[in-house]
Amino acid sequence: GATVLIGLTGGYPSGARGIKALLDSGEITQKQARRMLCFTVGAGPAFVISVTGSGLLGSVQTGIILFISQLSAALVLGILVGLFARGEEAPAEARGGASSASMPVSSALVEAASDGASSMISMCSFVILFSALLVILDQSGISSFLKEVFSSFGLPDRMASSLVPVLLEVTTGSTAAAAAGAGAPFLSFALGWAGLCVDFQIFSMLRSVSFSKAVFLLFRLFHGLLSALFTVIGLHFFPITETVFFSTGQSLSGGLALRA
């Protein structure tokens, strides 16, 4: 319960860290870890409401709708996963409790600090890697080529121009989408999808978990699409004035890259 809550509200990739901790302590099985991973990836409320809603779109109300949409999509996925998993094994008995309880405080502090530092270095490394990749794609003209490809399939230019960064890195993608005027539903998709940068952080963190990367990415896609759908519904019942979605990029472009 707590791990699911942290995964949905603690920001990327806190859910994966919680799953790893439960698996390492023997409180869940590999199957349960795989199921939890399908719906416990989410951005934190500070990033969604403050940065994306208030900062990029100019509306706290829109940010709240985005956050509720993301939570709703995750809950739908969690319910579906639970329905398909009904009748499978009961939760595993905790096997790591005794060793955790007997660990000296000094050792626990050292382990916690080492784990935190390792996670932070990993996160920063992937952010730098994907930021560099985006620059290479942009400078080489590949991003422009892909934009034309996306447009040829009927995707509006304001979405096609920012789809590559959205697919790769959520902060850069969200900023680009807002600057292009792609609208709240598209940003909601970006937040639900989370970007390959976050996905690779999770893959690195959960090397001990045997799971299909393709299935995981498919659930990320479903999460993004459901988030966008719920945002459309939310904006229908709680409409926001059009002025909210005007060019945020003029004042914010490039200024939020380090604020995720």
Please identify what each model-predicted range represents.
Residues 46, 75, 182-260:
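C-terminal transmembrane helix pair
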Residues 86-114, 244-258:
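Intrinsically disordered, low-complexity non-transmembrane regions of multi-pass membrane transporters
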Residues 22-30, 37, 54-57, 148, ...:
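Inter-helical loop and helix-membrane interface segments of multi-pass membrane transporters/permeases
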Residues 59-60, 78, 82-94, 139, ...:
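Transmembrane helix-loop junctions in multipass membrane proteins, especially transporters and channels
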Residues 113-191:
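Transmembrane helical segments that form the transport core of multi-pass membrane transport proteins
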Residues 1-57, 162-180, 185-209, 218-221:
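Alpha-helical membrane segments and immediately flanking helix-loop junctions
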Residues 62-79, 259:
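Alpha-helical transmembrane segments
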